[in-house]
């Protein structure tokens, strides 16, 4: 079941998903024929339900996913009552607590259906306690990679603690770069901490093999890293390798959007038009990156090349280079749309370059004083960043205000991710 779960998650192969569905109940039946006095009896059944729930979410089967999460949670709670010292219960309960603790308000019905209260802080405590066991007790070693994967994904998306990301990155580099799934985690973690050179080094260690599921998303990540370094030739080649080989739907529009950006920056007008048409024709607008790509091509906004290059350098962690370019831009030549991004990018660079708290906050406040006539994500994101600044200062009252302000915005790019981060921030403070 685990192999099917990973294959479906990685390849997004809908036909394989449909083909394997009937096997879920057959596998559960086999598990139920085992020793009922074992702590693995209910735990293993919960694993099956959780894996299928995550796969169903990938294909938007939300109601069935909610049902399966409820089944998994009830089995785990029952198992915890029967075997309170069985540490592996905390693995899945921890994941569920974190994910449900950050769930957007429009999906609160899932919490009601499952009857589980999310708690981000206690969820992380659960997972780190399991990781400790996997490292120190031989019989739990086989779960170490999985727990590191969960923690990496959740630390990237649910918390803003650089040291935690560094610690997980070091663990992966020490033990696990033979696993493409953990290569993916290491690449994303190094990008999150702003070290694009390390991301490239990690991805360049991937060796193709006929024995592995093709993980084409690694080509996408490699292309992104080359784009951040302004290596347009290699970036274009890797994006094309991704779109020509990956048979799923996610990141296709995003990849073609990046190809159109490369064409714009290299003055290849015909190729830009070709790639923009592909954005509208191929892939689906399910994940935030693809929604953004489709919106951008439909808006037909006039981009500023220097501002775009500064954005790419920023995303790759080349912060001083990005700031140097921004400081060379004539602000009076920017339209209102681009001027908003200019102020936002300055504020974010002040953060990354460790300017004083007052300089950072003043830069964000300057942006928020502008009129949000384009419904841009820079405004809710600025409120979110202000909240995070206050949270680090342990000024919980001010942080709560700005997390709540973030949640009041609607209909903007990256809305799901930004609101999830704001909700997670609220819950972190309220948990304490």
Spans of model-derived segments:
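Short coil/linker segments at helix-helix boundaries
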Residues: 2-174, 291-295
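Solenoid-like repeat scaffolds
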Residues: 33-36, 81-82, 112-117, 132-137, ...
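Residue-level detector of the short coil/turn that links helix A to helix B
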Residues: 60, 67, 159-160, 194, ...
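Single-residue signature of alpha-solenoid repeat helices
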Residues: 20, 27, 65, 72, ...
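Residue at a conserved register position within TPR or TPR-like alpha-solenoid repeats
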Residues: 4, 11, 49, 56, ...
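"A position-specific structural signal for the A-helix of alpha-solenoid helical repeats
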Residues: 3-6, 44, 48-51, 92, ...
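Generic helix N-cap/helix-start motif at coil->alpha-helix transitions
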Residues: 38, 86-87, 105, 140-149, ...
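Alpha-helical adaptor scaffolds
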Residues: 145-152, 156-157, 191-192, 307-316, ...
């Amino acid at each position: 079941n685990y192999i099917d779960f990973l294959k479906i998650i990685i390849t997004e192969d809908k036909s394989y998903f449909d083909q394997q569905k009937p096997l879920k109940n057959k596998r559960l039946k086999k598990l139920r024929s085992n020793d009922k006095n074992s702590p693995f009896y209910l735990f293993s059944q919960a694993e099956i339900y959780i894996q299928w729930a995550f796969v169903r979410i990938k294909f938007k089967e939300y109601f069935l996913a909610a049902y399966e999460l409820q089944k998994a949670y009830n089995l785990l709670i029952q198992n915890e009552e029967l075997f309170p010292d069985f540490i592996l219960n905390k693995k899945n309960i921890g994941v569920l607590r974190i994910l449900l603790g950050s769930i957007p308000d429009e999906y609160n019905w899932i919490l009601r259906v499952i009857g589980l209260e999310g708690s981000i802080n206690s969820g992380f405590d659960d997972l780190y306690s399991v990781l400790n066991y996997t490292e120190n007790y031989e019989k739990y070693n086989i779960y170490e990679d999985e727990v590191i994967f969960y923690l990496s994904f959740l630390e990237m998306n649910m918390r803003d603690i650089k040291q935690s990301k560094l610690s997980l990155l070091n663990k992966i580099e020490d033990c696990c770069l033979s696993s493409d799934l953990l290569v993916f985690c290491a690449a994303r973690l190094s990008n999150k901490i702003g070290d694009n050179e390390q991301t490239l080094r990690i991805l360049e260690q991937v060796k193709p093999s006929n024995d592995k599921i093709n993980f084409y998303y690694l080509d996408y990540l490699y292309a992104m890293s080359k784009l951040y370094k302004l290596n347009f030739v290699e970036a274009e080649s890797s994006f094309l390798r991704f779109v020509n080989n990956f048979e799923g739907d996610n990141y296709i529009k995003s990849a073609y959007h990046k190809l159109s950006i490369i064409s714009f920056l290299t003055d290849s007008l015909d190729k830009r038009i070709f790639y923009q048409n592909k954005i509208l024709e191929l892939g689906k607008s399910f994940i935030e990156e693809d929604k953004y790509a489709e919106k951008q091509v439909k808006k037909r906004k006039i981009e500023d090349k220097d501002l775009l290059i500064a954005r790419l350098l920023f995303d790759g962690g080349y912060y001083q280079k990005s700031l140097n370019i921004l400081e060379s831009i004539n602000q009076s030549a920017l339209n209102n749309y681009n001027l908003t991004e200019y102020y936002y990018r300055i504020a974010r660079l002040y953060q990354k370059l460790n300017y004083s708290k007052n300089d950072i906050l003043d830069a964000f406040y300057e942006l928020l004083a502008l009129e949000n006539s384009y419904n841009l994500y820079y405004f809710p994101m600025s409120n979110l960043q202000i909240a995070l600044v206050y949270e680090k200062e342990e000024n919980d009252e001010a942080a709560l205000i700005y997390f709540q302000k973030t949640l009041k915005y609607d209909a903007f790019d990256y809305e799901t991710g930004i609101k999830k981060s704001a909700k997670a921030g609220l819950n972190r403070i309220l948990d304490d």
